[in-house]
Regions:
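Charge-biased, low-complexity intrinsically disordered regions
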Residues: 1-224
Length: 224
């Protein structure tokens, strides 16, 4: 899998660094041990954060800055990591989908980065390009219907958009049948060490909960 960071992204976030975790996996409907980890993190965050202070977490603050630079309101189109942590802090249960989705959500919450998880066999072509959404560009967000992605950072394959920091696309979403996983970590704060640590954390989760060897990690930035 080749990943290209476009000049569009570099112009609003020259220090962007991403990480791709690619692995063979086995998905399951539910993992009790994984949810024990999620609940432990929920308890800690409820003691340490508020719905206002979470906006200052480096990964979230940097993503919000990029949204504003691209002309998008980050309070209307919240980054996924902010959505998840905000929901926890409001005392609401996180959505339980399946082990892979839940695992990616945990990784996003733990580090504050917006992370996309994809069924890599659904990509068209062997290259993803990170650019900025255009007016009128069709995009069906998972569980959200048609989403206006103009001004949102977006990964595109040969057919079109597959992932934004707000919502990934229905076409390439993970399911119980997914065996070839790609997870993309978006480090708009430019902290390569923390992005790499997030990738290693995901590898550990895959080993524990998805019958995987953890796969491989590739870091990417501009110029690609």
């Amino acid at each position: 899998m080749n990943i290209i960071v476009s000049q569009e992204i570099a112009s609003v976030c020259p220090t962007f660094v991403g990480a791709a975790v690619e692995a063979q996996v086995v998905n399951t409907p539910y993992s009790e041990a994984l949810w024990e980890e999620i609940h432990m993190l929920e308890e800690r965050f409820r003691q340490e954060l508020t719905t206002e202070s979470l906006k200052d977490l480096p990964g979230i603050a940097a993503t919000r800055r990029v949204y504003k630079a691209c002309g998008k309101d980050p309070s209307r189109y919240r980054p996924a990591s902010e959505q998840l942590i905000r929901r926890m802090l409001q005392g609401k249960e996180l959505y339980q989908i399946d082990t892979l989705v839940d695992l990616v959500n945990l990784a996003s919450i733990a580090f504050g980065y917006s992370i996309g998880g994809f069924d890599a066999d659904k990509f068209v072509g062997d290259t993803l390009t990170l650019g900025v959404g255009r007016e009128g560009e069709p995009y069906e967000g998972i569980g959200r219907g048609m989403l206006n992605i103009a001004g949102l950072p977006v990964y595109r394959d040969a057919l079109g958009g597959v992932g934004t920091p707000t919502s990934d696309h229905e076409r390439t979403k993970m399911t119980l049948a997914t065996t070839h996983l790609v997870v993309l970590i978006n480090g708009y704060d430019g902290d390569e060490g923390r992005v790499a640590a997030n990738a290693r954390f995901i590898q550990d989760l895959l080993r524990k909960y998805a019958k995987s060897d953890g796969g491989t990690v590739t870091l990417y930035h501009f110029p690609s």
